[in-house]
A protein has these predicted regions:
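Non-catalytic membrane-proximal stalk/linker segments that position and tether the catalytic domains
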Residues: 1, 6, 11-12, 58, ...
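Cell-envelope/extracellular polymer assembly enzymes that use nucleotide-activated donors
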Residues: 1-4, 30, 165, 246-250, ...
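Short, acidic, metal-binding catalytic loop of nucleotide-sugar glycosyltransferases
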Residues: 15-28, 265-275
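A conserved acidic beta->alpha catalytic loop
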Residues: 33-41, 81, 282-291
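Short beta-strand-to-loop acidic/aromatic patch adjacent to the donor-nucleotide binding site
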Residues: 64, 69-84
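Conserved donor NDP-sugar-binding/catalytic core segment of glycosyltransferases
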Residues: 81, 85-119
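A recurrent flexible, glycine/aromatic-enriched loop bordering the glycosyltransferase active site
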Residues: 117-145
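A short, conserved alpha-helix in the catalytic core of glycosyltransferases
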Residues: 145, 156-182, 217
Length: 305
């Protein structure tokens, strides 16, 4: 396996190398660095620098594909400090090989304000589109699938949405597998609740990012035959009658007991100078999602099963 880890501080690189060189499964260690970083730091022994512009760009993904000759690549997708377990890479590789998945991600621990907390992630579901789906920082990807992604003749170039576009591509060509084991730790830099984070897309500062995400999503929907051509639909007549609510927030869920309360509370807490409601579509969840929704009370909250 080849490792590709973002690096902003040379001490972090040295610390990672001291641990990773103990792994017999590691073929090459590459640090993703800026041109300025590379110009001011000597490359430590036992690794290489791969100069990138930003972690989420197409140039970075292409550079990763160009610099690997292993069967699998491990990409750290965030600027964070990773705590490697004794068998982190071995478990990723064993499960990737056993399942023949194009991508494997795992449960992990998070260091939040000096406290280590378990951070289980959820199973990836077919059709999932959220660009902020929590895979954790470490993605173990089949190298051939990565090469095939880069080789697509119609592949778009992105500054912000390349990791998202890669994940959507992988979901089309193979299985994205959730390894239900706590295999590593990472530092949590954003301590907001998940329900608060998911409204980042409405922040004007994220406009360019969101435009690229929407473009990648639209192209993905077209490739899986799920893109809706709205030209065939009647335009609603909003003057036909009085509507009690000006807008509705629709939240579809299935087995989301860990996050549904935060998401609904965040939606209900939005400030607006007009009336709106929140409609949660519960797709017959088999966990406590329905019970949690039943406990949430608000005049403008509707649950549909």
């Amino acid at each position: 396996i080849d490792l590709f880890l973002p690096c902003e501080y040379i001490d972090d690189a040295q610390n990672a190398l001291s641990v990773l060189h103990e792994y017999k499964t590691v073929q090459h260690i590459h640090f993703l660095v800026s041109a300025d970083f590379a110009a001011h730091h000597q490359v430590p022994e036992g690794c290489t620098f791969v100069i990138t512009d930003r972690l989420e760009s197409s140039n970075t993904i292409a550079s990763i594909a160009e610099n690997t000759d292993a069967d699998y690549v491990m990409i750290c997708t965030r600027h964070t400090t990773i705590g490697w377990g004794n068998n982190t890479l071995e478990r990723f590789l064993r499960v990737a090989d056993d399942t023949d998945a194009v991508m494997v991600y795992a449960d992990h621990y998070k260091m939040v304000e000096g406290k280590m907390e378990k951070h289980p992630v959820i199973d990836y579901q077919s059709g999932s589109l959220r660009d902020d789906f929590d895979f954790g920082s470490l993605w173990c990807i089949k190298a051939q699938a990565l090469a095939d992604y880069i080789a697509q003749p119609d592949r778009e170039e992105y500054q912000f949405a390349a990791l998202y576009d890669l994940r959507l591509y992988l979901s089309r060509v193979g299985e994205i597998f959730h390894l239900n084991e706590f295999l590593y730790s990472e530092a949590e830099l954003d301590t907001r609740k998940s329900g608060e984070k998911q409204f980042d897309y409405v922040n004007p500062r994220n406009r360019e990012v969101q435009i690229e995400m929407e473009k990648a999503c639209t192209q993905h929907l077209g490739k899986v035959g799920a893109l809706i051509d709205t030209t065939f639909y009647r335009q609603p007549d909003f003057g036909e009658q009085d509507f009690e609510y000006e807008a509705s927030v629709i939240i579809p869920v299935f087995n989301r007991e860990k996050t549904v309360a935060d998401a609904v509370k965040s939606a209900l807490g939005q400030k607006a100078n007009f009336k709106f409601n929140v409609i949660v579509v519960n797709n017959h969840s088999t966990d406590r999602t329905g019970e949690i929704l039943d406990e949430l009370k608000a005049d403008n909250l509707i649950q549909i099963v």
